[in-house]
Amino acid sequence: MSEIMNQETISSLSREIGEENIPVLLDIFLGELENYQATLSESEGPEQLELLKEISHALKSSAASFGADRLCAMAIDIDTRGKQGLLLNTKQEKQNLIKQLRETYTSYMSLVEHES
């Protein structure tokens, strides 16, 4: 199973953009995670499938950029199956993604708090 937070990716990002810029970008990433959690949690009915596909598609790149490997892998899986029409249990997929968003958020919040 992939890591929640890939420290190597974060270190590489820090070298590329400058360590002083990491807190700002992490705040943006954490805000995205919160918004996605809220949006998915509030969604019901037929809109769930479209939101799940949209959010997973958006998460693929942002999660990869920040080394959120487990979230990225899940987003890629959901996005791929969504494009193939293979998302069978939307409610369960949604709950799994919300859980992973929460775990990722908690993990990255601890990094932000540690940096402060």
Label each PLM-derived region with a short phrase.
Residues 1-3:
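Hydrophobic membrane-targeting segments
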Residues 5, 61, 93:
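Short acidic-hydrophobic sequence patches enriched in Asp/Glu that either
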Residues 8-55, 91-112:
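Long, amphipathic alpha-helical coiled-coil segments characteristic
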Residues 32-88:
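Extended, amphipathic alpha-helices with heptad-repeat/coiled-coil or helix-bundle character
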